[in-house]
Amino acid sequence: MFSIRIATVVLAASAALRPPARITNTETPVNQCGSGSIQCCESVQSASAAQAAGILGPLDILTNLQGLVGSHCSPLAAVGVSGTSCSSQTVCCKDVSKSGLVNLGCSPINLNL
């Protein structure tokens, strides 16, 4: 009976002395955007969509693009700062063209994590 109590105490002590497990976050922070910039776009659609072709054609931008195209975008420079928000689609875009009128190579991101 006494040996069971000692074994229990030893197990409890060894568990208490064990270092905590290290957790590594492999996700890219939401306020960072790989090789592009965080934008708030009124509209985001596939580059092959008719709506995107209608925007890209008159601006002399190649229409054989792939991926997502954001239109009427504005930069979100200070993500996480009070008052910074996007009521439309938040995206990470690699190429900002025509002063944000059209952004190419966009990927949707979630700032509400």
UniProtKB/Swiss-Prot annotation:
InterPro entries: Hydrophobin. Its main location: secreted. Disulfide bonds join C33-C92, C40-C86, C41-C73, C93-C106. Disruption phenotype: Leads to retarded growth and displays denser aerial mycelia. Slows down primordia formation, leading to fewer primordia and subsequently fewer fruiting bodies. Residues 1-23 form the signal peptide. The keyword Disulfide bond applies. GO terms for molecular function: structural constituent of cell wall. It is found in: Secreted; Secreted, Cell wall. Coiled coil: none annotated. It comes from the Eukaryota. GO terms for cellular component: extracellular region; fungal-type cell wall. Keywords: Cell wall, Disulfide bond, Secreted, Signal. Pfam families: Hydrophobin (PF01185). Belongs to the fungal hydrophobin family. Self-assembles to form functional amyloid fibrils called rodlets. Self-assembly into fibrillar rodlets occurs spontaneously at hydrophobic:hydrophilic interfaces and the rodlets further associate laterally to form amphipathic monolayers. Aerial growth, conidiation, and dispersal of filamentous fungi in the environment rely upon a capability of their secreting small amphipathic proteins called hydrophobins (HPBs) with low sequence identity. Class I can self-assemble into an outermost layer of rodlet bundles on aerial cell surfaces, conferring cellular hydrophobicity that supports fungal growth, development and dispersal; whereas Class II form highly ordered films at water-air interfaces through intermolecular interactions but contribute nothing to the rodlet structure. This is Fruiting body-specific class I hydrophobin fbh1. It comes from Pleurotus ostreatus. The lineage of its organism: Eukaryota, Fungi, Dikarya, Basidiomycota, Agaricomycotina.
